[in-house]
UniProtKB/Swiss-Prot annotation:
It catalyses: 1-(2-carboxyphenylamino)-1-deoxy-D-ribulose 5-phosphate + H(+) = (1S,2R)-1-C-(indol-3-yl)glycerol 3-phosphate + CO2 + H2O. GO terms for molecular function: indole-3-glycerol-phosphate synthase activity; phosphoribosylanthranilate isomerase activity. The keyword Amino-acid biosynthesis applies. This is Indole-3-glycerol phosphate synthase. It comes from Rhodospirillum rubrum (strain ATCC 11170 / ATH 1.1.1 / DSM 467 / LMG 4362 / NCIMB 8255 / S1). Keywords: Amino-acid biosynthesis, Aromatic amino acid biosynthesis, Decarboxylase, Lyase, Tryptophan biosynthesis.
Amino acid sequence: MSDILREICDTTRAEVARRKAALPLADVTARAEDANAPRGFANALTRTADSGRPALIAEIKKASPSAGLIRPDFNPAVLARAYHAAGATCLSVLTDGPYFQGHADFLIAARAAVPLPVLRKDFMVDPWQVVEARAMGADCILVILAALDDGAAAEIEACAHDWGMDVLAEVHNEEECARALTCLTTPLLGVNNRNLKTLVTDLAVTERLAKMVPADRVLVAESGLRTRKDLDRMTAVGARRFLIGEHFMRQPDVGDAVRALIG
């Protein structure tokens, strides 16, 4: 685990402990039970990919540890509507506060604004966060293999499936990919092209790991995707689903940016 990921996970555990003390499991469970039904994140991506179009998970991200503030004029609902109008299939919303300036309210606002399924993009270290995600209305959660051992990853995935949510497994290298294929059952295998130690992106990561992916799993290419040529390069190795955030967040008109990439 990289130093920054370890720091983020330690901070997240402390934050989760604080929230659990303030909101007992019974209370967050009641909220989750009252939430609108999951919208089918994985199925939405499959429908788009099967139609021959790029299946885009468009990300709503205000800031990051490496880049700082990315989008000063940040309005989750406005961004969600622009993404939807431009043809995005799903949304990803950062809810981590300490490092990404995210918030649960951002996910709630984005999901209320459009009919698209939404991924809660956060550092999941405790099954309690899964119930919390469903209470927010999330349709999918992220499981980062670099942040969890196999048992914890499987436990969090099982909890998500119990709540009817999908899971996006995220890997960065061959070792994590092999672990994900062994300990998780989700078909969504996200390959993050960003090196967690250097923060450099390299599309060759997806090209390498694509060779490991069996027929019952689907590739989601993440990070470093900026042009249609990049998407074509990923499609050539079997990735027809893409998670893109910072590139869009830096554009004056995110809708135009999406159309330029997938239109």
